[in-house]
């Protein structure tokens, strides 16, 4: 906003001068510019505003009493200064801000404006010290008495360092609170002592008059009216009806209503629904008595609207009923009133009752006088000259008088176009619920209209007095009696123009009293003036001893060693805030239970000294760490006793570590930080800490690792005179021989093979599968090597040259920058050809090596040359490799047959039968060939050799007979270039790169196998020791991998056509139950035209439809009412209710089968022992079931899916993942048994987080052995014994910064000569310097800033691996161990990876012997006490299929947090934490063992379909376990029964209808507080979304509305998980636990395995019309929000999903969207 220049008036400057020197309370009457004084003071004290606090910077506080005032003052400061202003009120959720957020705010802003409590907390929690403030301005400071935060704030001054205190400036227009108009002087003295300064105003009378000119002095008028005597019969009748209703209301039972907390937690909202109803009726009676029947007929409509909305919002049926009864009564009353009004008119038309005559006749004298005054004052005036305020006492009166005036003005011609009324009420609702958001919006527009002059008569409830700035008014009417001095001063202060009138209405009888009162008020005003006149600016400041005495209190504040202060009066709020951090579902409200002790109890505990005093006890909620009862000290009154108890409880919580050093409940982050050194200290060396918030950019930054070659391949280059080992490589075809495959079949099986020659011995390696175009082959590396000694350096040189020739000339895997590496470093071994020598022994084929130091270059020849050469001989061509030089390519071909019977002049076969071979060749290539010399010689038949070099996956190319025949080519030998290289060796070479690469990773896998076996002490087992024979590598057939003809992988997506997800509507019963499940609708943000009518302002014309609309709007149900009428049953029956389900669980008709089975019967008796044991569990129990962990399994575990092999880590990772969660759960539950479930879950999620696993695996030094890159030999593979020039390679070691700018183009420019590449291994100096220059030039060219690493890394042994892959590897390795060695051994591996640290006396192998300890289980309880809670528990045990030995576990598993009576065990949360992990692990193990054909993605879907909350809830209900839950919450039981009815209609099956019901997690679980996790760029967007959420009626805070949208209560699934944990803890036998689970889940295990339910995101994406778009996630503290925009009925709709991580939030958004679509598709 542009700066508004306001000129200071003389007296303002003098006040500021005084304030510069000392504290003061500025007293200036309303309208004389206090705010401006404050702004001048801020400017005087701003010298250190722009320094940071650390270097002596200062800040200013501006404290206000209410949110509206604070908002107004913040705007004023921003308008008139250039300071950075921050605005803070409780509603923004500042209570939950972290220290980091506060320090950012304090760093950023210089003047902090806000409400008092916020600043009080800010200083007590040491976010800012008093010494860092230069000035504190306190607006409306006369409130600072008693325990008001203003006074509490000033109390802090007494315990702070006295030399560094800020200046205190109070501002007020009245010096006295309310009506305390006696002994003004003492009151004022106290005020001065509180604020440590004098009241100051302007010094002499002349100035005082001056202020009075500026300030307000209206003419005061008093209008009296006769007291009304007669009471109409109708009034009596109505009063009697209401009395009667009260009696029946008291008898109604509406169940236990959950207690709702306000934002500040100071007071309870909604404590009694009944008293709310009574209050409305009492209000109505008051209106009728005070303003007459006509007014009453308007007031009753307000009630009807209110009750109708409440009825629709009612959470339980009984509450609905209560509001319905009230509604009926209102209708009746309205009828009586309207009838009475119609007595005066002659017809029954409603409209005729709104005449001036009727209004005057049926109003009380007071209203009559008021209307007369209006008429007299304003008749036929110019509306622009009128600015009138009418003050009334009650909120409802505003609406009522507003309605009355509208009709009166309409029916009075003189006023019709003159007055335009509006009304405004104070805000009483603390909850920022939907209605108050609308309300505030409407209020704002009301004030705006008044300011703009569109409305010129404003009716306000007296709350408007303080500070809400409505411009100068010339008429103020006070309709109701003035109650307090301040009200008088301030409402009078509203009349600000010089000829203003201030009109009071009073009854004749009260006239004297009122005059008396007004006189007293004026006298008080004068007293104040006297007090000030006597001591204007010469007064002495209050002495220190006066201040000390003034703040003396019953309880001393507690200061801890960090200097933070715990004020007794803050203790209650802290306690409540602490309870809010205790985890609970939407229905368990956790609050401390206060109890006033009876005398006998009190005397027993405190003895005689406590006689006549009050003692209060506090019990914390069931799941809090503090289990003991806390007693207050005996106090004089209940209030201080309560404070004392809360104060003591806070001190205990502080000592237990539940409050942090600032006395604020510990956040999850702080709790994690407190154990970071125990579990996460290894993060530090990677520059990370577990509490650090992750910046998105850093989080995704993947690390680069130095690859490590297997030990056996390092420094293994053969040397002269030393023993070397040659390991022969055998290829065995696994396909049938036929015309097409024959050449391959025969050539692979010749005795000539290759071997790898090296100085180290190799372990036994598993046989590996490869896939050629002809089919599958097996590759075996010989177990026993050939031992050889190289005699001389000539032989060694020959071996080197042949090795280089193989890769350079035949395989062509050679970049111009490669050199032969003779240093014997990584992968230093040679490839040698073997031949069958004398005595059938294999030996080196020296002859071949001698002949082929280099492969001859193919070249053509002209006719003369061919005439001079000898004629070709058949024996030279048999089995050799040739190439057609005259065709345009240099393709090697294998000669498969020599046709002696054919000549070039023979006729061709097949389609060219009319030509000879000679004619055909000449016609195509004649001009290149010239002619054929030897026309009478033989012909050769050749086959193309594949160019592919990767053979890991099956090539799914389709070969039909025609293309196979085409493979057969007949050529003229004289026109071919013959390499003379043996065809079988050439053919075997093609497979070599794939084999060598696979051996490389197999050796790594073998090393891991040995390493783990040794650690676990299993290397001595016979099958793991020296006799270990690896099993052949297994192909995971579920990974349907496809390749194109070149061997590149084609990703497989079995993409089906998008299909509509509808199926026929099953039965009437579903349709009925669906109608009850109101799945709420959100359309966001609402457009203006969708906003409901402002009911209060259109009371008289509101129709039921609008009420219905308002209700649907307020709960977010805006649906097109006309298009979709829920009640229209036929409409539903004719349609299908859209959601996909197949023929689930056989075709039983739902809901019929079990109609006559009693509720508590088991669904089916379970027989022990018929469940197939899980292999993993057998291995856990005994060693004889252990199987060796195979080399191939370790290989799979280090192979990422990105490597595109026929096996990878994903399947093992599913098992490892669930094992990891299980072990982390058991470990934390036993190590920190007294933590609450929220903290356990948080630490667990950090323990199993990808970041933690990443650091653990790096610590174990495994990442460098992973296979994560698809094998492409020609582009990203360094063959053995080959490297970059050594001097170039050194750059990476010696100058890593420079190495970053080396690009692949620079390497290609290296153009090495043969001398450099094959002999020296270094590049020449000229070349080298040119190369370095070229790299430097990259900085200037368009390569500047490019990242070459991905293209260059393979040459220098570096690899970049995604962090997630590394975490998955760790899980997969654990999976290998669990699968083969069982749980105990796998627990030991956790210590190996340092994921868990064992305690001295608790080795990790004993994790399964978990003791549930902690303070939560009371020992020595007898069974009768337990069974007192467990009614009919044998039915439960029968249905569960398990009988408990110790029923304490059972009791704990059934106790909901809302059940305060059970103090024996605590609630089920701890068990649920354990049960969740046990269930997840056992189900994962089962599907892992039983679904080998299912791909990993489907396995994951299957697992989540089985263990998600909805499925658990269905199973819980199907087994009738919900009857036994111990909870005290009407809302919860109603939602459960709603869900049970729905499930019965579904035949208790988990259908897809059920799967999209909303769970609690889908409805926003925690308040969205702005935590530092938020990416700053997304902040405005997130805020917008959050505020839209708020407007939409999803309150952004607390539990206000959350539970209304839940269809599936989390409690059902939680109880089932808790019962599973209870079974395990009771029997300590996982196999027995599995039997129980299997019997519960059997129908789903079979059904879902048959047809895996696809997850909601895919379901949405595959929907025909939806076209969903998901937003990127917005992180908010512990919550993530994802929005999803999709199309439904041609409209774009946006929904929001919440969850604890990105995937959950996305799933939840998809669910919301599917629910919408399910309606639209109908």
From Swiss-Prot:
In ovary (at protein level). It catalyses: Endonucleolytic cleavage to 5'-phosphomonoester. Disruption phenotype: Abolishes RNA-induced silencing complex (RISC) assembly and RNAi silencing activity. Abolishes siRNA unwinding prior to loading onto the RNA-induced silencing complex (RISC). Decreased levels of endo-siRNAs. Increased susceptibility to infection with RNA viruses such as Flock House virus, Drosophila C virus or Sindbis virus. No effect on the processing of pre-miRNAs. RNAi-mediated knockdown inhibits the induction of the antifungal peptide Drs in response to M.luteus challenge. Also highly susceptible to infection with A.fumigatus, with 80% of flies dying six days after infection. Changing residue 1476 to A: Unable to unwind blunt termini (BLT) dsRNAs and fails to rescue loss of RNA silencing activity in mutants. No effect on binding to BLT or 3' overhanging (3'ovr) termini dsRNAs. It comes from Drosophila melanogaster. GO terms for molecular function: ATP binding; ATP hydrolysis activity; ATP-dependent activity, acting on RNA; deoxyribonuclease I activity; helicase activity; mRNA 3'-UTR binding; ribonuclease III activity; RNA binding. Residues 1653-1722 are annotated as: Essential for efficient and high-fidelity siRNA production and siRNA loading. It comes from the Eukaryota. PANTHER family: DICER-RELATED (PTHR14950), ENDORIBONUCLEASE DCR-2 (PTHR14950:SF36). Residues 1-555 are annotated as: Essential for binding and cleaving blunt termini (BLT) dsRNA substrates. No effect on binding or cleaving 3' overhanging (3'ovr) termini substrates. It holds the Pfam family Ribonuclease_3. This is Endoribonuclease Dcr-2. Residues 1268-1362 are annotated as: RNase III insertion domain a. Belongs to the helicase family. Dicer subfamily. One of its GO terms (cellular component) is nucleus. Residues 1520-1609 are annotated as: RNase III insertion domain b. The keyword Transmembrane helix does not apply. Changing residue 759 to A: Decreased siRNA length fidelity. Abundance of 21-nucleotide siRNAs produced by the enzyme is decreased whereas the abundance of both 20- and 22-nucleotide siRNAs is increased. Partially rescues RNA silencing activity in mutants. Residues 230-347 are annotated as: Helicase insertion domain. Residues 713-855 are annotated as: Platform domain. Activity towards dsRNAs such as hairpin dsRNAs, short dsRNAs and microRNAs, is inhibited by inorganic phosphate. Binding to inorganic phosphate may function in substrate discrimination by blocking the enzyme from binding to nonphysiological substrates, as the presence of inorganic phosphate at physiological concentrations inhibits processing of the inappropriate substrates microRNAs (pre-miRNAs) and short dsRNAs but does not affect cleavage of long dsRNAs. Coiled coil: none annotated.
């Amino acid at each position: 906003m542009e700066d508004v220049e306001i000129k200071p008036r003389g007296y303002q400057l003098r006040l500021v001068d005084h304030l510069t020197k000392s504290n003061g309370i500025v007293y200036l009457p309303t309208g004389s510019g206090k705010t401006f004084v404050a702004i001048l003071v801020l400017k005087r004290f701003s010298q250190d505003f722009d320094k940071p606090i650390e270097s002596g910077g200062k800040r200013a506080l501006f404290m206000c009493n209410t949110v509206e005032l604070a908002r107004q003052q913040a705007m004023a400061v921003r308008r008139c200064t250039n300071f950075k202003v921050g605005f803070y009120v409780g509603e923004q959720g500042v209570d939950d801000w972290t220290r980091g957020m506060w320090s950012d705010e304090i760093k950023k802003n210089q003047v902090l404006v806000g409400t008092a409590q916020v600043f009080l907390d800010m200083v007590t929690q040491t976010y800012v010290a008093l010494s860092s403030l230069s000035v504190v301005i306190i607006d409306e400071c006369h409130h600072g008495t008693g325990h008001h935060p203003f006074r509490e704030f000033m109390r802090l001054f007494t315990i702070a360092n006295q030399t560094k205190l800020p200046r205190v400036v109070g501002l007020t227009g009245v010096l006295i609170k309310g009506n305390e108009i006696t002994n003004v002087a003492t009151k004022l003295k106290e005020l001065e002592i509180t604020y440590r300064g004098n009241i100051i105003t302007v010094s002499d009378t002349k100035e005082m008059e001056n202020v009075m000119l500026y300030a307000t002095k209206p003419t005061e008028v008093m209008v009296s009216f006769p007291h009304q005597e007669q009471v109409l019969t109708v009034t009596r009748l109505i009063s009697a009806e209401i009395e009667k209703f009260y009696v029946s209301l008291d008898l109604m039972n509406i169940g236990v209503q959950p207690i709702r907390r306000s934002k500040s937690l100071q007071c309870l909202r909604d404590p009694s629904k009944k008293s709310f109803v009574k209050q409305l009726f009492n209000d109505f009676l008051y209106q009728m008595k005070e303003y007459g029947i006509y007014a009453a007929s308007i007031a009753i409509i307000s009630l009807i609207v209110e009750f109708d909305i409440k009825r629709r919002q009612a959470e339980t049926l009984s509450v609905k009923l209560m509001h319905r009864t009230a509604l009926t009564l209102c209708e009746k009353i309205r009828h009586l009133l309207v009838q009475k009004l119609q007595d005066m008119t002659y017809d029954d038309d409603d409209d005729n009752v709104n005449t001036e005559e009727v209004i005057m006749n049926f109003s009380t004298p007071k209203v009559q006088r008021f209307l007369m005054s209006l008429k007299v004052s304003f008749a036929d005036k110019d509306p622009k000259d009128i600015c009138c305020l009418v003050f009334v006492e009650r909120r409802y009166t505003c609406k009522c008088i507003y309605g009355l005036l509208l009709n009166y003005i309409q029916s009075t011609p003189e006023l019709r176009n003159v007055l335009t009324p509006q009304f405004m009420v104070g805000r009483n609702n603390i909850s920022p619920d939907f209605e108050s958001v609308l309300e505030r919006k409407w209020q704002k527009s009301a004030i705006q209209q008044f300011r703009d002059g569109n409305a010129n008569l404003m009716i306000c409830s007296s709350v408007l007095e303080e500070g809400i700035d409505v411009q100068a008014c010339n008429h103020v009417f006070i309709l109701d009696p003035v109650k307090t001095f301040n009200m008088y001063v301030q409402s009078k202060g509203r009349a600000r123009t010089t000829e203003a009138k201030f009109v009071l209405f009073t009854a004749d009888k009260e006239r004297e009293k009122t005059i008396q009162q007004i006189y007293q008020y004026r006298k008080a005003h004068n007293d104040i003036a006297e007090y000030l006149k006597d001591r204007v600016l010469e007064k002495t400041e209050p002495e220190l001893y006066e201040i000390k005495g003034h703040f003396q209190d019953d309880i001393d504040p507690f200061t801890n060693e960090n200097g933070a202060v715990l004020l007794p009066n803050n203790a209650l709020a802290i306690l409540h805030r602490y309870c809010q951090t205790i985890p609970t579902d939407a229905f368990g409200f956790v609050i401390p239970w206060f109890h006033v002790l009876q005398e006998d109890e009190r005397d027993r505990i405190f003895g005689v000294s406590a006689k006549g005093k009050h003692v209060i006890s506090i019990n914390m909620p069931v799941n809090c760490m503090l289990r003991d009862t806390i007693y207050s000290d005996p106090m004089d009154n209940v209030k201080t006793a309560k404070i004392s108890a809360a104060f003591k409880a806070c001190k205990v919580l502080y000592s237990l570590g539940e409050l942090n050093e600032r006395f604020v409940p510990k956040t999850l982050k702080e709790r994690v930080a407190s154990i970071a050194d125990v579990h996460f200290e290894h993060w530090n060396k990677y520059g990370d800490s577990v509490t650090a918030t992750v910046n998105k950019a850093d989080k995704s930054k993947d690390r680069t690792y130095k690859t490590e070659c297997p030990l056996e391949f390092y420094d293994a280059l053969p040397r002269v005179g030393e023993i070397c080992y040659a390991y022969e490589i055998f290829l065995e075809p696994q396909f049938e021989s036929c015309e097409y495959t024959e050449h391959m079949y025969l050539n692979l099986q010749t005795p000539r093979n290759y071997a790898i020659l090296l100085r180290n011995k190799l372990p036994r390696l598993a046989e590996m599968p490869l896939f050629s175009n002809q089919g599958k082959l097996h590759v075996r590396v010989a177990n026993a090597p050939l031992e050889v000694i190289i005699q001389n350096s000539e032989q060694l040189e020959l071996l080197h040259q042949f090795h280089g020739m193989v890769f350079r000339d035949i395989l062509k895997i050679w970049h111009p920058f490669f050199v032969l590496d003779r240093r014997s470093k990584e992968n230093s071994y040679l490839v040698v050809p073997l031949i069958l020598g004398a005595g059938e022994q294999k030996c080196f084929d020296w002859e071949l090596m001698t002949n082929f130091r280099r492969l001859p270059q193919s070249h053509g020849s002209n006719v003369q040359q061919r005439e001079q050469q000898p004629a070709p001989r058949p024996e030279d061509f048999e089995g050799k490799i040739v190439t057609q030089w005259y065709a345009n390519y240099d393709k090697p071909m294998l000669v498969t047959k020599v046709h002696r019977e054919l000549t070039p002049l023979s006729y061709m076969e097949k389609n060219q039968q009319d030509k000879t071979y000679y004619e055909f060749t000449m016609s195509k290539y004649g001009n290149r060939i010239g002619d054929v010399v030897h026309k009478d010689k033989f012909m050769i038949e050749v086959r193309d050799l594949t160019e592919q070099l990767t053979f890991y996956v099956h090539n799914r190319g389709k070969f039909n007979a025609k293309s196979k025949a085409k493979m057969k080519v007949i050529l003229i030998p004289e026109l071919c270039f013959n390499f003379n290289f043996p065809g079988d060796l050439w053919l075997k070479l093609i497979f070599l790169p794939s084999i060598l690469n696979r051996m490389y990773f197999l050796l790594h896998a073998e090393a891991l196998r040995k390493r783990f076996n040794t650690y676990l002490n299993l290397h001595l087992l016979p099958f793991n020791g020296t006799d270990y024979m690896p099993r052949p590598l297994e192909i995971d057939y579920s990974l349907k991998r496809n390749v194109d003809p070149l061997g590149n992988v084609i990703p497989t997506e079995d993409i089906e056509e998008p299909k509509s997800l509808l199926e026929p509507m099953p039965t009437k019963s579903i349709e009925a139950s669906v109608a009850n499940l109101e799945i709420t609708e959100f359309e966001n943000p609402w457009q203006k035209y969708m906003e409901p009518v402002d009911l209060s302002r259109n009371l008289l014309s509101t129709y039921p439809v609008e009420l219905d609309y308002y209700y649907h709007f307020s709960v977010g149900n805006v649906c097109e009412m006309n298009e979709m009428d829920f009640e229209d049953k036929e409409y539903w029956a004719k349609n299908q209710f859209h959601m996909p389900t197949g023929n689930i669980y056989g075709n039983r008709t739902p809901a019929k089968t079990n109609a006559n089975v009693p509720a508590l019967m088991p669904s089916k008796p379970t027989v022990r022992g018929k469940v197939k044991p899980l292999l993993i569990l057998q291995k856990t129990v005994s060693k004889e079931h252990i199987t060796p962990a195979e080399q191939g399994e370790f290989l799979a575990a280090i192979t990422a899916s990105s490597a595109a092999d026929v096996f990878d880590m994903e399947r093992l990772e599913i098992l490892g993942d669930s094992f990891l969660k299980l072990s982390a759960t058991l470990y934390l539950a036993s190590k920190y048994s007294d933590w609450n479930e929220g903290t356990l879950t948080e630490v667990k999620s950090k323990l199993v987080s990808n970041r933690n696993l990443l650091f653990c695996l790096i610590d174990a030094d495994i990442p460098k052995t992973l296979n994560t890159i698809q094998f492409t030999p020609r582009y990203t593979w360094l063959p053995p014994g080959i490297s970059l020039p050594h001097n170039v390679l050194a750059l990476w070691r010696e100058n890593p910064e420079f190495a970053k700018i080396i690009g692949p183009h620079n390497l290609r420019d290296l153009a090495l000569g043969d001398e450099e590449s094959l002999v020296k291994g270094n590049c020449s100096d000229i070349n080298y310097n040119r190369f370095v220059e070229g790299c430097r030039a990259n900085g200037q060219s368009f390569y500047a800033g490019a990242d070459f690493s991905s293209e260059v890394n393979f040459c220098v042994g570096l690899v970049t691996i995604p962090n997630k892959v590394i975490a998955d590897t760790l899980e997969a390795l654990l999976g290998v161990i669990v699968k083969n060695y069982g749980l105990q051994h796998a627990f030991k591996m956790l210590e190996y990876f340092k994921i868990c640290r064992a305690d001295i006396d608790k080795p990790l192998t004993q994790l399964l012997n978990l003791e549930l300890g902690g303070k939560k289980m009371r020992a020595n309880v007898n069974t009768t006490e337990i069974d007192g809670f467990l009614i009919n528990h044998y039915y439960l045990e029968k249905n569960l299929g398990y009988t408990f030995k110790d029923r304490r576990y059972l009791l704990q598993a059934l106790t909901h947090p809302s059940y305060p009576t059970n103090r024996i065990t605590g609630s089920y949360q701890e068990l649920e934490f354990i049960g969740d992990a046990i269930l997840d692990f056992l189900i994962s193990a089962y599907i892992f063992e039983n679904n080998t054909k299912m791909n990993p993605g489907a396995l994951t879907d299957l697992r989540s379909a089985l263990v998600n909350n909805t499925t658990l809830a269905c199973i819980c209900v199907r087994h009738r376990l919900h009857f036994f839950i111990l909870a005290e919450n009407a809302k919860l039981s109603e939602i459960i029964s709603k869900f049970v009815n729905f499930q019965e209609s579904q035949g208790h099956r988990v259908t897809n209808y059920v799967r999209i019901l909303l769970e609690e997690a889908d409805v926003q679980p925690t308040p969205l507080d702005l935590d530092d996790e938020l990416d700053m760029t997304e902040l405005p967007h997130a805020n917008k979304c959050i505020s839209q959420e708020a407007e939409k009626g999803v309150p952004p805070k607390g539990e206000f509305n959350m539970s209304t949208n839940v269809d599936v209560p989390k409690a059902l699934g939680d109880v089932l998980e808790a019962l599973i944990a209870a079974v395990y803890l009771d029997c300590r036998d996982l196999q027995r636990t599995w039997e129980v689970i299997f019997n519960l889940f059997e129908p789903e295990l079979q059904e879902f395995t048959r047809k895996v339910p696809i997850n909601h995101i895919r379901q949405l994406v595959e929907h025909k019309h939806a076209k969903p778009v998901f937003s990127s996630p917005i992180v908010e503290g512990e919550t993530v929000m994802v929005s999803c925009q999709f199309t439904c009925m041609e409209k774009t709709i946006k929904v929001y999903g919440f969850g604890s991580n990105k995937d959950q939030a996305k799933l939840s958004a998809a669910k919301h969207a599917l629910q919408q679509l399910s309606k639209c598709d109908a």
